[in-house]
Amino acid sequence: MTTHHGRRWMALGWRLFFAPALIASIQVAAPVRVAAQATDRLPERLSDANFWALVDSISEPGGFFRIEDNFTSNEREIGQLYTMLRERGTRGGVYMGVGPEQNFTYIAAIRPQMAFIVDIRRQAVMQHLMFKAIFEMAADRAEFISMLFSKPRPPALDSTTSIQAIWEAFWPVKSDSAAWQSNYARIVELLTRTHGFTFTADESAQLKWVYDSFYGWGPVISTRGGPGGGGGGNGTTFADLTGYSNDASGNPRSFLSSEENYAFVKGLHSRNLIVPVSGDFGGPKAIRAIGAWLHERGGVLSAFYVSNVEQYLFQDGKAASFYDNVSTLPVNEASVFIRPYSLRRYGFSIQSLCPIAPFLEAARAGQAPSNNAALACPR
């Protein structure tokens, strides 16, 4: 597939690397704490024009990231974190995240009023717009999978079918080239004509590349493409993450694990309330612009999923800028960072669901001078 599309897969290992402590302390601004409150000034929906204007006004130009394509997550901890968020009572407010489909699972767990997904790569924005279109057109989970991978829908799948049974029904079904062409045309039609979004030539090419990749690799698509994805995806596939990522009780948890979860995410997309943004976590604009927008409307951040982005921020000397940016977001005592790699390292919820305000205060006091220290959630 890589030869067919003329793309070069980067053979970078993706083992977690803990950057050494390069600085003795980080100068971080004090977090903006707000009282727990109803966020009734947040919009119940955004018009197409307002949604697209918001994407444009908040976004920074697309930037470089070491992983050129990031089609899926590779974090199998998502099922555990889903249930941990539910048990902790992290609920409502505004969600922020990074990366592809795993955000929908955290959104399904938290049930926020709206969400912002920030990624340095502009292609990530186009991938989320692809997801948006499919969510809006697909009535249920089986139709979502059918459209995403251009596979005819098997019979006898309904709202009561378990996600693993849905995947078992799809495995023997071959992808269909006619459906692929038709689905892609419908996606473009919905985004550009129905919604009125305008894309550059590069953005249109990115949208097609992403959809072609899901068609070409099928449900075994992983971070960089196929299983293992050229040395960086650790073999975890889209099907694994949505159907076989279990919580501590052995139950699969994802945005596709129940019809209710799917319907919630679909509803936010249908009201233009999942906003994809191109921006650098350590950059000058995106996160701060989101913070200003939320402050104006009384919004409160409930959770910020950061994956392992902090690892790269410490390597690039941008961690202090990131924490400074986060300090401009409206948070309260319940607001948390979601850090899967803390769960992998420590196995406790207090590290992996790290309270944001106390952490930022600890960072100001020099207690988070490295990625390794940040993962421990000093407070």
Language model regions located:
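Conserved SAM-binding loop of SAM-dependent methyltransferases across substrates and taxa
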Residues: 102-110
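Conserved class I S-adenosyl-L-methionine
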Residues: 90-101
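N-terminal secretory signal peptides that target proteins for export/translocation
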Residues: 1-11
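Mature N-terminal segment immediately following signal peptide/propeptide cleavage
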Residues: 42-87, 94
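Alpha-helical subdomain
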Residues: 215-379
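Boundary at the C-terminal end of the N-terminal hydrophobic targeting segment
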Residues: 34-38
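Class I S-adenosyl-L-methionine-dependent methyltransferase module
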Residues: 113-275, 368-379
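Bacterial N-terminal signal peptides
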Residues: 13-29
